[in-house]
């Protein structure tokens, strides 16, 4: 039995989607393979991509809650009620997807008034 590649390709072109699906399943079963795309695995010890977007998270208000609320209002543009709720419900993200410089600046402002802040 000679294999004619052109005939096989012509048959595949004429097949319906359901028939092709059945063909793939049969090949998977017959040869013990899978048609799933291979997953790229990052090399261990390789240089990790540098993070470009950061999130500033208020961990806790510390002792001077009123000062922290004022700074949160300044940073986020929220109203008094919303800023107070955010501070009361810490830990909460204040700003997301920002540059490292801006994140460090916000962290410094909040820590200056006694808040505990994390940059992620």
From Swiss-Prot:
GO BP: any one term: translation
GO CC terms of this entry: cytosolic large ribosomal subunit
Keywords annotated in UniProt: Ribonucleoprotein, Ribosomal protein
Source domain of life: Bacteria
InterPro entries per record: Ribosomal_bL12 (IPR000206), Ribosomal_bL12_C (IPR013823), Ribosomal_bL12_C/ClpS-like (IPR014719), Ribosomal_bL12_oligo (IPR008932), Ribosomal_bL12_oligo_N_sf (IPR036235)
Single annotated GO MF: structural constituent of ribosome
Keyword hit for Kinase: no
HAMAP family in alphabetical order: Ribosomal_bL12
Annotated PANTHER family: 39S RIBOSOMAL PROTEIN L12 (PTHR45987), LARGE RIBOSOMAL SUBUNIT PROTEIN BL12M (PTHR45987:SF4)
Name of the protein: Large ribosomal subunit protein bL12
Organism: Listeria monocytogenes serovar 1/2a (strain ATCC BAA-679 / EGD-e)
Gene that this sequence comes from: rplL
């Amino acid at each position: 039995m000679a294999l004619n590649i052109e005939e096989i390709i012509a048959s595949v072109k004429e097949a319906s989607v359901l028939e092709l699906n059945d063909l793939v399943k049969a090949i998977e079963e017959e040869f013990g393979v899978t048609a799933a795309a291979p997953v790229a695995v990052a090399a261990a010890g390789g240089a990790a991509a540098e993070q470009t977007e950061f999130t500033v998270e208020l961990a806790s208000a510390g002792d001077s809650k009123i000062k922290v609320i004022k700074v949160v209002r300044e940073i986020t543009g929220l109203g008094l009620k919303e800023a107070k709720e955010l501070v009361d419900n810490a830990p909460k993200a204040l700003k997301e997807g920002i540059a490292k410089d801006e994140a460090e600046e916000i962290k410094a402002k909040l820590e200056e008034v006694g808040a505990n802040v994390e940059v992620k």
